[in-house]
């Protein structure tokens, strides 16, 4: 079974390093160009902008399959003079942010560039509003795209040191999505851009939340304009907390952890796609607390089977507590019968591969993939087309 798991990981889950590097270079070069153009379109954005955080499963090392989808956070910073105050809301995992000295901030000489902040970002009583933030971000992305040459009514063109790319866009959830293609029309990737606000450790939530495990090296966290499950009022006041930088350190340097996560994600894609990938990552964050470092150095078979059983225990209990605030049950919105069915399905798979380890491939792979597996095809080696010659030069991103 060990050989089968390693083979599946190599041929159906993990991309060759050169393909990963190529898409990463294209992404970062296009985003660098696009963000610089965004700064020219809105002085307020230029003043607020701190950095881009390259988040999501690709940069965590947990991506399954082709690197065609990326999650990027556009981190914005509110000056301390405005006295931003974060308060835990009545929904675990969500906070409210209020500016207690907005007018004093705006009266400062350097505050002039922020004169439209209230109109564009704040609701009643100077609370930061998710709806206004999303609309501002949508408008800014549209305005930036309009500065680029248009190929047709839906596609514009961006040129940088890696070549010429076609970009279109659409809106989904809290993200603005950029679709990036080669000028030939061949799709490269979709990039979700989310405007977030970043805060330092002195604003870290306290009541019911874990303390920062890396206060000196990773002191910052984000708030994201994502609404809670279920009805809340006022809707625009709720911001989701994000501790992605700390999570990345927690899962790093644990030998078999990332391959095991990717195998379970591969299984969920086939058998229970209604469980979000982040929930699986959260389960592993809880498991990390219970295991010492030596556990992750065991065989992939043992780590995979152990973590799969523990993952199924969370599903059977119908609760995956948010790692940073246990009161927030990440799967609380799913129907009990749905979770029972998922747990029973995973339980059957566990028993089957315990009795017949060679059956693991049938459970992890689709019918088409299994046929290719039997035929010995290396699917991931052919997952991405080669870059055009003009984009395979020795350009270095500075």
Swiss-Prot record:
<dbReference type="Pfam" id="PF03281">
    <property type="entry name" value="Mab-21"/>
</dbReference>
<keyword id="KW-0464">Manganese</keyword>
<feature type="binding site">
    <location>
        <position position="289"/>
    </location>
    <ligand>
        <name>Mn(2+)</name>
    </ligand>
</feature>
<keyword id="KW-0391">Immunity</keyword>
<dbReference type="InterPro" id="IPR046903">
    <property type="entry name" value="Mab-21-like_nuc_Trfase"/>
</dbReference>
<keyword id="KW-0051">Antiviral defense</keyword>
<feature type="binding site">
    <location>
        <begin position="69"/>
        <end position="71"/>
    </location>
    <ligand>
        <name>ATP</name>
    </ligand>
</feature>
<keyword id="KW-0694">RNA-binding</keyword>
<keyword id="KW-0808">Transferase</keyword>
<keyword id="KW-0479">Metal-binding</keyword>
<feature type="binding site">
    <location>
        <position position="192"/>
    </location>
    <ligand>
        <name>GTP</name>
    </ligand>
</feature>
<dbReference type="InterPro" id="IPR046906">
    <property type="entry name" value="Mab-21_HhH/H2TH-like"/>
</dbReference>
<dbReference type="GO" id="GO:0045087">
    <property type="term" value="P:innate immune response"/>
</dbReference>
<feature type="binding site">
    <location>
        <position position="192"/>
    </location>
    <ligand>
        <name>Mg(2+)</name>
    </ligand>
</feature>
<keyword id="KW-0342">GTP-binding</keyword>
<dbReference type="GO" id="GO:0051607">
    <property type="term" value="P:defense response to virus"/>
</dbReference>
<keyword id="KW-0399">Innate immunity</keyword>
<feature type="binding site">
    <location>
        <position position="71"/>
    </location>
    <ligand>
        <name>Mg(2+)</name>
    </ligand>
</feature>
<feature type="binding site">
    <location>
        <position position="69"/>
    </location>
    <ligand>
        <name>Mg(2+)</name>
    </ligand>
</feature>
<dbReference type="GO" id="GO:0046872">
    <property type="term" value="F:metal ion binding"/>
</dbReference>
<dbReference type="GO" id="GO:0005525">
    <property type="term" value="F:GTP binding"/>
</dbReference>
<protein>
    <recommendedName>
        <fullName>Cyclic GMP-AMP synthase-like receptor</fullName>
        <ecNumber>2.7.7.86</ecNumber>
    </recommendedName>
</protein>
<keyword id="KW-0547">Nucleotide-binding</keyword>
<dbReference type="InterPro" id="IPR024810">
    <property type="entry name" value="MAB21L/cGLR"/>
</dbReference>
<dbReference type="GO" id="GO:0003725">
    <property type="term" value="F:double-stranded RNA binding"/>
</dbReference>
<dbReference type="Pfam" id="PF20266">
    <property type="entry name" value="Mab-21_C"/>
</dbReference>
<feature type="binding site">
    <location>
        <begin position="244"/>
        <end position="247"/>
    </location>
    <ligand>
        <name>ATP</name>
    </ligand>
</feature>
<feature type="binding site">
    <location>
        <position position="57"/>
    </location>
    <ligand>
        <name>ATP</name>
    </ligand>
</feature>
<feature type="binding site">
    <location>
        <position position="265"/>
    </location>
    <ligand>
        <name>ATP</name>
    </ligand>
</feature>
<keyword id="KW-0067">ATP-binding</keyword>
<feature type="binding site">
    <location>
        <position position="292"/>
    </location>
    <ligand>
        <name>Mn(2+)</name>
    </ligand>
</feature>
<keyword id="KW-0548">Nucleotidyltransferase</keyword>
<feature type="binding site">
    <location>
        <begin position="240"/>
        <end position="247"/>
    </location>
    <ligand>
        <name>GTP</name>
    </ligand>
</feature>
<feature type="binding site">
    <location>
        <begin position="277"/>
        <end position="281"/>
    </location>
    <ligand>
        <name>ATP</name>
    </ligand>
</feature>
<keyword id="KW-0460">Magnesium</keyword>
<dbReference type="GO" id="GO:0005524">
    <property type="term" value="F:ATP binding"/>
</dbReference>
<dbReference type="GO" id="GO:0140700">
    <property type="term" value="F:3',2'-cyclic GMP-AMP synthase activity"/>
</dbReference>
<dbReference type="GO" id="GO:1902615">
    <property type="term" value="P:immune response involved in response to exogenous dsRNA"/>
</dbReference>
<comment type="function">
    <text>Nucleotidyltransferase that catalyzes the formation of cyclic GMP-AMP (2',3'-cGAMP) from ATP and GTP and plays a key role in innate immunity. Acts as a key sensor of double-stranded RNA (dsRNA), the presence of dsRNA in the cytoplasm being a danger signal that triggers the immune responses. Directly binds dsRNA, activating the nucleotidyltransferase activity, leading to synthesis of 2',3'-cGAMP, a second messenger that binds to and activates Sting, thereby triggering the antiviral immune response via activation of the NF-kappa-B transcription factor Rel (Relish).</text>
</comment>
<comment type="similarity">
    <text>Belongs to the mab-21 family.</text>
</comment>
<feature type="binding site">
    <location>
        <position position="288"/>
    </location>
    <ligand>
        <name>Mn(2+)</name>
    </ligand>
</feature>
């Amino acid at each position: 079974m060990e050989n089968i798991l390693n083979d599946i990981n190599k041929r159906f889950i993990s991309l060759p390093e050169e393909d990963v590097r190529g898409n990463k270079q294209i992404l970062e070069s296009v985003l660098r160009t696009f963000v610089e153009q965004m700064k020219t379109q809105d002085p307020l954005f230029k003043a607020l902008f701190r950095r881009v955080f390259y988040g999501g499963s690709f940069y965590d090392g947990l991506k399954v399959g082709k690197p065609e989808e990326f999650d990027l956070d556009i981190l914005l910073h509110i000056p301390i003079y405005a006295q931003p105050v974060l308060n835990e809301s009545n929904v675990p995992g969500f906070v409210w942010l209020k500016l207690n000295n907005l007018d004093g901030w705006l009266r400062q000489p350097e505050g002039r560039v922020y004169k439209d902040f209230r109109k564009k970002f704040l609701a009643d009583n100077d609370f930061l509003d998710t709806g206004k933030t999303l609309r501002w971000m949508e408008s800014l992305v549209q305005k930036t795209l309009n500065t680029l040459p248009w190929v047709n009514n839906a596609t514009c063109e961006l040129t940088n040191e890696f070549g010429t790319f076609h970009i279109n866009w659409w809106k989904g959830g809290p993200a603005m999505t950029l679709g990036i293609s080669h000028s030939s029309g061949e799709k490269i990737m979709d990039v979700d851009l989310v405007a977030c606000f970043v805060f330092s450790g002195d604003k870290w939530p306290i009541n019911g939340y874990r303390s920062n495990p890396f206060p000196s090296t990773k002191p910052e966290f984000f708030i994201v304009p994502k609404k809670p499950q279920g009805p809340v009022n006022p809707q625009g006041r709720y911001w989701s907390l994000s501790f992605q930088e700390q999570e990345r350190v927690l899962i790093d340097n644990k030998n078999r952890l990332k391959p095991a996560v990717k195998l379970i994600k591969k299984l969920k894609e086939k058998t229970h796609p209604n469980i979000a990938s982040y929930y699986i990552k959260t389960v592993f964050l809880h498991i990390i607390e219970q295991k010492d470092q030596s556990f992750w150095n065991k065989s992939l078979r043992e780590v995979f089977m152990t973590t799969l059983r523990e993952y199924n225990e969370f599903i059977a209990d119908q609760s995956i507590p948010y790692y940073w605030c246990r009161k927030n049950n990440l799967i609380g919105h799913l129907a009990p019968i749905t979770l029972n069915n998922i747990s029973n399905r995973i339980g059957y798979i566990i028993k089957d591969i315990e009795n017949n380890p060679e059956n693991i491939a049938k459970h992890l792979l689709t019918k088409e993939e299994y046929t290719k597996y039997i035929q010995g095809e290396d699917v991931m080696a052919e997952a991405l087309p080669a870059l055009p010659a003009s984009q395979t030069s020795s350009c270095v991103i500075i």
